[in-house]
């Protein structure tokens, strides 16, 4: 998961906070990226079950908008500002997920992938463009001893956002395959939908 300490997006547009326009709040705005990161790292296993909750405790209070000077947004707020879920994936994989637009923490924590042969810690980031500002760490055993292997950050040789746009345009122009397979998008959206439906029960 991930999130923002005080980051309900209303400084330039209020469409993110209105259910009839956005459908989802933090869950759909930034939660999709957190889920995509983990699903991609795991090889995009099929989601089996989702149990989740989504709340609006902060977005409905005028205090949540004090930094942007828009207390009237509290009356318009009709989406989630926090969501959490327990997601079972194919292969016996369990995903514990949290995302927030507003919280009294700097982060709900790093992304941690735990396995039987080792674990991977992906540092939390405020950036949602697929880049990291801290190295990842692999926790594993070597010769029966627990060790930590830091995965160094490699400097980007090109602009990652530009590469994403160009790969999409190339697929459109040449009629080639989409850079992201449809199944990955469907799995991501199924998880988001499952969290919201579970919360509505």
Regions found by a protein language model. Name each.
Residues 1-76:
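Predominantly a Rossmann-like dinucleotide-binding segment in NAD(P)-dependent oxidoreductases
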Residues 16-21, 67, 149-154, 171, ...:
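A short, mixed-charge helix-start or loop-turn motif at secondary-structure junctions
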Residues 26, 157, 177:
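Conserved acidic
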Residues 28, 32-36, 159-166, 183-190:
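A structural signal for well-ordered alpha-helical segments within the folded catalytic domains
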Residues 41-45, 119-120, 192-198:
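Phosphate/oxyanion-binding loops and surfaces in catalytic or ligand/nucleic-acid-binding neighborhoods
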Residues 45-47, 93, 176-177:
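Secondary-structure boundary/capping signal
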Residues 55, 73-164, 181:
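NAD(P)-dinucleotide binding in Rossmann-like oxidoreductases
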Residues 90, 143-146, 153, 166-201:
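C-terminal helix-rich "cap/oligomerization" subdomain common to oxidoreductases
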């Amino acid at each position: 998961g991930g999130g923002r300490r005080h980051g309900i997006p209303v400084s330039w547009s209020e469409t993110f906070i209105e259910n009839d326009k956005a459908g989802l709040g933090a869950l759909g705005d930034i939660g999709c990226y957190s889920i995509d990161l983990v699903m991609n790292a795991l090889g995009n296993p099929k989601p089996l079950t989702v149990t989740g909750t989504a709340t609006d405790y902060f977005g409905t209070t005028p205090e949540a908008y004090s930094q942007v000077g828009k207390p009237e947004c509290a009356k318009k707020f009709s989406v989630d500002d926090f969501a959490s879920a327990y997601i079972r994936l194919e292969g016996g994989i369990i995903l514990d997920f949290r995302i927030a637009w507003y919280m009294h923490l700097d982060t709900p924590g790093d992304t941690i992938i735990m396995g039987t042969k080792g674990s991977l810690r992906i540092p939390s980031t405020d950036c949602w463009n697929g880049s990291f500002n801290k190295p990842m760490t692999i926790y594993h055993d070597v010769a029966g001893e627990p060790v930590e292997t830091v995965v160094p950050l490699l400097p980007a040789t090109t602009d990652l956002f530009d590469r994403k746009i160009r790969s999409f345009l190339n697929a459109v122009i040449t009629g080639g395959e989409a850079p992201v397979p449809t199944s990955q998008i469907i799995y991501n959206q199924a998880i988001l939908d499952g969290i919201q439906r579970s919360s509505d029960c």
